Amino acid sequence: MNSVLERVYEIGIIPVIAFNSVDEAIPLCKALMDGGLPAAEVTFRTACAEECIKKIHEELPNMLLGAGTVLTVDQADRAMAAGASFIVAPGFDPEVCKHVIDKGGIMMPGTATSGEMQQAMNMGCEVVKFFPAEANGGVDKLKNIGAALKTCKWMCTGGVNAKNVNNYLGYNQIIAVGGTWMCKSDKIKAGAWDEITAMSKEAVNVMLGLELGHIGINCADEAEAAKTAETIASLLSMAVKPGNSSIFVGKKEFEIMKKPGRGTHGHIAILTNNVDRAIYHLSQRGVKFDMDSKNVKDGKTIAIYFADEVAGFAIHLVQK
């Protein structure tokens, strides 16, 4: 994927916004950015959309902007000129698709059938929009279509919310979802920016699904590791499962290293729904990663260590 689509994938959730006033543009986008979502699909459902895109692009250059509900060639041109990095439509219009692609833009046409998706792919659309997602069969439908259209990638909007977001993002051909649950129109009208920031943070946390995987404890040698494992197992009535380089206790809650491993005292594994997205979002919070430790499988990162220890423990992210 190109760099814009890579960033869409990393961010994962793209807020969909219909501005009522240009005055809402900057404070809303700042609230989203503060909540960890530096992206927006600004819909052409309102007259001020073009002006809002231009203002955000000029004042918040780190905000990834898409234009949504683009129905005509003229709207597409105006959106791209204003600073939109990608164009989204509710339906599949070959004329608009071809025009945007011919101008070097990124087009995500709305599709609901495999026929529309195939036509869009053949026109050069790398990612298509699945809309309205829930009303059209949701992720189960896409899994059936994806078995045939293996190179098709989707951004899903329409009925996506905090309860089902990971059902969508858990399918590897879906690069992102769009939604409004973190920036409802009533909150925007009320100027409830702090609430929007809080809901955006919660959306990111739900998406990442960070949780403790296991604790690794360094030992000097195999004998010390065996003794440590037996001690923990007896205290907690857990099973011991010896391995080549370590001994697991319980359901792998503890990993006892047979020789000193990474970290002064050991390591802590944090599980996540998507390591690549976690790297992006935690980096925005100031976390630094040891990129040489990255473990990649089938094009996706499955594990990576933080650059710095915490209280003598190395920390690594691990794919669930």
Where are the regions a protein language model picked out?
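Glycine-rich phosphate-binding active-site loops on the catalytic face of alpha/beta enzymes
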Residues: 90-96, 129-139, 173-196
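Vicinal oxygen chelate
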Residues: 252-258, 283-320
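Core segments of cupin and vicinal oxygen chelate
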Residues: 28, 45-47, 216-254, 284, ...
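C-terminal helical cap(s) of enzyme catalytic domains, especially alpha/beta-barrels
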Residues: 100-105, 186-209
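Catalytic beta/alpha-barrel core
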Residues: 16-18, 39-46, 63-71, 84-92, ...
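Conserved, mostly hydrophobic/aromatic
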Residues: 15, 32, 79, 128, ...
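Catalytic cores of alpha/beta
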Residues: 28, 72-82, 115-123, 140, ...
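N-terminal beta-strand motif that seeds the catalytic metal site of vicinal oxygen chelate
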Residues: 4-18, 204-229, 263-270
